[in-house]
Amino acid sequence: MSRGLGDVYKRQDFLQRGVPAIADKYTRTRMALLGGADLVLELPAVWATASAEYFAAGGVQLLGKTGVVDTLCYGCETPEKELMQAIVEVLSKNASDYQMLVSSSMKQGNPFPAARSHALCSLLPSFSSDVVSSFLASPNNILALEYEKAIARWNSINSVHDHILSSMPVQRIGEGYHSTKTGVTYASATAIRNALLTPSENDGNHNHSMCISTGSYDFGLSQMLPDTSASLLAAFAQQNLLLDMDAFSFALYTRLWALHDEGCADFADCGKDLSHRIDQHLEHFLSFSQFADLLKSKNTTYTRICRALLHILLNIRQDDYAALWQPDGIPYLRVLGFRRDSSVLLSAIKKEASVPLITKVADASSILHGIAYKRFLHDVACADLYRTTSSMQIQTELPNEYRQPIVLV
């Protein structure tokens, strides 16, 4: 971006995979700032917990609306620009053919990822099927594609305003997305989470399903993360503040039970079939993760189930998705933290941003109105659910959004 500075947008306390982050957004913001980021902005929950398509669209909108960002840098497994652009063109110009092929493949019993791969291989005869299939097998590459699509859409809408975004794909190195190997220099996020969330067989606390093993946050962590991030997460683990999805099991069950008569079909990523399965199997509910595994089917992935259940928990409905692709979708920019020596960036955004900039939660009521304020309050409610769950886990009250200061380093 201009001025030689960089900002980062963070997904909230809840993630695109349909699970909570293991550490709260303020701790992760501090990690990002100490790791070199100049400014951290929050992606609202409706986008942060959505599928890759909407998640990427929200991220591009958020950065574009700062008025100062000119380049989006993202990681991918294989930065094959030519193949990415070819796929983006197919998805943009041959969307109906693509959807027809995907639908046909899924009717034959193939899950969506396989149907997507089959459709794109058919529509891209100039590339070998092995190359296309291998590219699509990586979740990071899928997100990279969605970023490219979102950037193309942003540029087509904003070209008259001379505010064009470019992309800079960076090839990831080290372990793969699903690798669980620890003690290596470039471990996957999965491996880091597993190292932190290893259950202790000797812990007799059964009030929640996740117990932190006293030694698990030390072995290999300093090899896998920068020193500042490793020490912050180690301290978090020592305080028993790390959360996994099963920490929200009771909250999810009570929510599903309360919706028994209404059903869940109106919630984002759910639909009538999944709503019916939820109703059928609710009596067998033991935990968030167990119930998601129970509900998965050949045509519905575990991640999709988790995302649907999270949307039910966070009250994100199909109607909320209507705004996700709209050019004016992101209604505000909320600052989670910044470096003191990069205040020039914050000043530039205050001057150039096309939507209100929120640096203090208490000021939002006088700055935001209508749907913008409604979305903000929803984000506050999501954060409060995460905070309350953490507070109950350690039996200590934690500061809410109105008392949580902005992170400065």
Which residue ranges define each predicted feature?
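N-terminal beta-loop-helix "entrance" segment that forms/cooperates
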Residues: 13-25, 30-33
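Short loop/turn motifs at secondary-structure junctions
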Residues: 4, 36, 67-68
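Short, small-residue-biased leader/transition segments that mark boundaries at the very start
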Residues: 2-9
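Active-site cores that bind ATP or allylic diphosphates and position pyrophosphate for catalysis
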Residues: 43-409
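A glycine-rich helix N-cap at a beta->alpha junction
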Residues: 34-44
